[in-house]
Amino acid sequence: MSPGGERGEQSVTTATRAEVCVMACAEAWRGDGEILAAAMGTCSVLGARLARLTFEPGLLTTDGGALLTAEAIPLGAPAAADGAEGWLPFREHLWLVQNGRRHVMMGASQIDRHGNTNISVIGPWDRPKSQLLGSRGAPGNTICNPVSYWIPRQSPRVFVEKVDMVSGVGYDRARALGPSASRFHGLRRVVTDLGVFDFGTPDGAMRLVSVHPGVSVDEVIAATGFELATGTGEVPVTREPAGEELRLIREVLDPKSLRDREVKA
């Protein structure tokens, strides 16, 4: 298979870039146990559902709305009447947020080296170029819950030296705010179309953990607008889904290949 091939040209056993991203997102929930997996974005939703179907069966997943599903369902499919195992109204969802029983994988319009994120405005606060979603749940999510990020298109415009507004709290700000902000604060991983990152340096700065197949470290650095820690040795290649994992992605969770619209090969 050519990495840039269409769905019909794919090898049965070789993963596309989008499928690698799904697998990398799934790994964010490894070891979480019985916790709500809240995901935003095609590949992150697929990742949460893949994790539940494979190595993390205790995860709680939803239909994208207020229903907890008895099992992971295909992307875009409603939970069948007999496939819902619970109702999760907004007040109960907020209880989970406030009590750390939710691992959310959010998106970010901007992210800096310490994991501060912006989903509110682009440009100066008093005269922004663009108005975005607003901070919404980002402050509470990052203070109260484990948080990861899924960014489909990494570039220096997204990976920035300083965010235009802080919506989600990073490690430097959590430390500065003290125990009330840092007690439950934890940024697990960042997954992009180029690689996987964590915040494993002594000062909680972003570190390159792996590059996706076919991507070089230099490409990742060129797509990053701040100094990125890469370690002293060779950067590993992100694990590809294989065998049953590929079958679940292609035949069970995303038979319409919606993942390929989010991440081009």
Describe the residue ranges of each PLM region.
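N-terminal amphipathic/basic-hydrophobic helices that include classical n-h-c signal peptides
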Residues: 1-9
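Short amphipathic alpha-helical segments, especially helix-boundary/capping motifs
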Residues: 1-2, 20-25, 192-198
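Conserved phosphate- and dinucleotide-binding cores of soluble alpha/beta proteins
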Residues: 74-233, 237, 241
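A conserved C-terminal secondary-structure "cap"
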Residues: 223, 231-265
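Short, charged helix-to-loop "capping" segments that act as catalytic/coupling loops
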Residues: 30-32, 100, 244
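N-terminal active-site beta-alpha-beta segment that forms phosphate/nucleotide-binding
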Residues: 8-83
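Generic detector of well-ordered alpha-helical segments enriched in charged/polar residues
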Residues: 23-26, 218-221, 246-250
